[in-house]
Amino acid sequence: YHKYSVKDYYAVDEQYGTMQDFEELAAECEKREIKLLIDLVMNHSSNEHEWFKHASKSLRSDPCGAAKDKPCLNDNICPVHDKYIDYYYFTDEKPVGTNSWYRIGSNRWYQAVFSEQMPELNLDNSAVRSEFEKIADFWLEKGAGGFRLDAVKEYFSGNPEKNIEVLNQFMKHCKTVDPKCYVVGEVWESFTSYTKYFSSGIDSVFGC
């Protein structure tokens, strides 16, 4: 209902309108010197996103038989070769002392802190970061003036230094594409805690 379980980062949810509606809105905002920000969720996706569905299918499949450094024999539907498995956090055993892991298939678990429908993305993976740079490029080209980044402090919960490093890379990319791009991050912490995030180069942050 809240649309933070993203199924497609390159589409407008039909409840909000069409891509044409977005483009027209962006054009009208530009005429009025209003920045139109995209609410961008990098912490997690929907479990119905193609990345997660592809990884899930591979984890339920048998290995194709080829070595990891050789081409897959099953069109990358394979627990050895599927790159999307590393887009998320999967494990063979449920970690003890946490309720944020959910079963997939008979012997695998995935992490989803906010809900079972929103698996955590692995922002340690450079390929995942590159995906979001491409997503940013797409929306900036469509006329967005920047981004509101959701749940920034949860990228690596309890590790603000790593969160800041992710933000810094994202900011450098966005400012290279559009120096006037404006980015604000949701950091749900006290003022004294979230001010450290300005060291990432982000334009603004907000919290409680």
Predicted features by range, described:
Residues 1-130, 141, 148, 152-203:
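Acidic/aromatic-lined carbohydrate-recognition and catalytic surfaces
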Residues 135-136, 142:
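Pore-domain-biased detector for 6-TM cation channels and related repeats
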